[in-house]
């Protein structure tokens, strides 16, 4: 009888605790804000090659700009030129 009563009281207490849980909103701090991304397009000599993303990143690195993501596309096929559209973590634009 004691164990049954203890079990019932435990269940009621757990139910009460779980029913009073509130949703907590996160506080936005300066460190957690989403930073804006700068996008820039540049035409380079040569084609995209096997890995256009890395080819574009190397092309921008040569001109002292450091993107974190690039997409390579053909700009002028007869002259073997590519266009790189890259995203930068800060604004070189």
UniProtKB/Swiss-Prot annotation:
Which InterPro entries did the record assign? SCRL
Which Pfam families does the entry mention?
Answer: SCRL (PF06876)
| One GO cellular component, as annotated | extracellular region
List the keywords (alphabetical).
Antimicrobial, Disulfide bond, Fungicide, Plant defense, Secreted, Signal
User: Major location, coarse class?
Assistant: secreted
Q: Which GO terms describe its biological process?
A: defense response to fungus; killing of cells of another organism; signal transduction
Family membership = Belongs to the DEFL family.
What protein am I looking at? Defensin-like protein 229
């Amino acid at each position: 009888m004691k164990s049954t009563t203890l079990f019932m009281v435990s269940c009621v207490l757990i139910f009460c605790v779980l029913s009073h849980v509130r949703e907590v909103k996160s506080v936005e701090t300066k460190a957690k804000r989403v930073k804006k991304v700068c996008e820039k397009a540049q035409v380079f000599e040569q084609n995209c090659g096997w890995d256009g993303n890395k080819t574009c990143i190397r092309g921008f690195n040569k001109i002292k700009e450091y993107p974190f993501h690039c997409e390579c596309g053909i700009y002028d096929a007869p002259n073997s030129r590519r266009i790189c559209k890259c995203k930068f973590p800060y604004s070189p634009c």
